[in-house]
């Protein structure tokens, strides 16, 4: 008989207030066992507050938090089977790497020999065995990050909390650490809860993402759903790049609606429940879902003029102006095919929006 594994974390109607200020407004979400879960949002959205509530560093004003079915909001941090990796790593400068990693185990009452053996295992996992006798000051930023990870993983917590741990690293090292973190999570089987404001980090590493803004949960889903099917204007604008327009729904035909832009142009897209003819809503079109052509091939092509090409290495962003000077960003790959679809400033072109790429959004 199979037994269903409970969720690693269940947050139920959690509220956090500081005096008259409400930092978290009735948040409910579940994080699965062995999941890489990301809390994503801009500064001040409440993501770190929620992480600290799970860790026990912040009290819960209202609501409940469960860890593998056990209610924990009243437990002190040292009685919760979680560990936290902080943004500043918090390594002990007077201890070498081996001592730093084994410190938590010794505090839990493990014999020194057993603590060193476990520290050696985890250092091998993070590929730092050769640096075991070095002090933190003798390590690079990326190596210090891996020591902090090793120290947090050594006691084998049920959940690992990571509070923007990559923000101090340069771009290339940050990219490498993203892959390493994902690998570590898979190797250890421990649930990771990762806090970041970086959309690329979230999309690269996460099994699922909770997008937060102003203390509220805006959307929860996997990376593809969050990017391809944003729940509202905030998510569409915050995740990746997009063109946002205010439109009016002019007519409906089954599952499709005809929308009019402020400049009078119209575009057909999928209908969305709760939106009716006459409603003024927002439309999102991702730049990579738009093609520029030298001649008209579809009935809904828009005529436009190229204003600027912005070279970005792997791709090129082209800014065009539609009727009435309405700007539109188009992104093409920097490849032979992509270059054949790039036009010089001043060129008259036709804009081809792939059907299904325009998405209507709640305000």
Curated annotation (Swiss-Prot):
Membrane topology reported for the UniProt record: Peripheral membrane protein
Residue ranges annotated for the ABC transporter domain, each copy included: 9-239
Alphabetized SMART domains for the sequence: AAA
Short name of one Pfam family: ABC_tran
Main location: membrane
Location(s), subcellular: Cell inner membrane
Ranges annotated as spanning the membrane: none
Its EC number(s): 7.6.2.11
Catalytic activity: ATP + H2O + polyamine-[polyamine-binding protein]Side 1 = ADP + phosphate + polyamineSide 2 + [polyamine-binding protein]Side 1
Residues binding ATP: 41-48
Sample GO molecular function, one term: ATP hydrolysis activity
Keyword Hydrolase carried by entry: no
Keywords: ATP-binding, Cell inner membrane, Cell membrane, Membrane, Nucleotide-binding, Translocase, Transport
Keyword Nucleotide-binding appears in the UniProt entry: yes
CDD domains in alphabetical order: ABC_PotA_N
Enzyme type, top EC level: translocase
A GO CC annotation given for this chain: ATP-binding cassette (ABC) transporter complex
Family: Belongs to the ABC transporter superfamily. Spermidine/putrescine importer (TC 3.A.1.11.1) family.
Primary role: Part of the ABC transporter complex PotABCD involved in spermidine/putrescine import. Responsible for energy coupling to the transport system.
Assembly and binders: The complex is composed of two ATP-binding proteins (PotA), two transmembrane proteins (PotB and PotC) and a solute-binding protein (PotD).
PANTHER family named among the record's database cross-references: SPERMIDINE/PUTRESCINE IMPORT ATP-BINDING PROTEIN POTA, SPERMIDINE_PUTRESCINE IMPORT ATP-BINDING PROTEIN POTA
Protein name listed in UniProt: Spermidine/putrescine import ATP-binding protein PotA
Species: Roseobacter denitrificans (strain ATCC 33942 / OCh 114) (Erythrobacter sp. (strain OCh 114))
Organism classification: Bacteria, Pseudomonadati, Pseudomonadota, Alphaproteobacteria, Rhodobacterales
